[in-house]
């Protein structure tokens, strides 16, 4: 009688769904008010002129205009601003 011993069980085999974080609108792109610019965990990028910060640290445009990324301040922080068109 052909027989195969049962394989053992494993404790692996699961992974979390990706959260699609990152920059959604890059420097120089034009955006409308309310457009999401960056999705992030924590403030990797800080809000500058005409940019709002959501409760999950999402950065969004408050006005229509062009996206501008810059590094400034004593701690070399990244900021994103909207230059009104």
Swiss-Prot record:
Residues 1-26 are annotated as: Disordered. GO terms for cellular component: cytosolic large ribosomal subunit. One of its GO terms (biological process) is translation. The keyword Nucleotidyltransferase does not apply. One of its GO terms (molecular function) is structural constituent of ribosome. It holds the Pfam family Ribosomal_L27. Keywords: Ribonucleoprotein, Ribosomal protein. Belongs to the bacterial ribosomal protein bL27 family. This is Large ribosomal subunit protein bL27. The lineage of its organism: Bacteria, Pseudomonadati, Pseudomonadota, Gammaproteobacteria, Cellvibrionales.
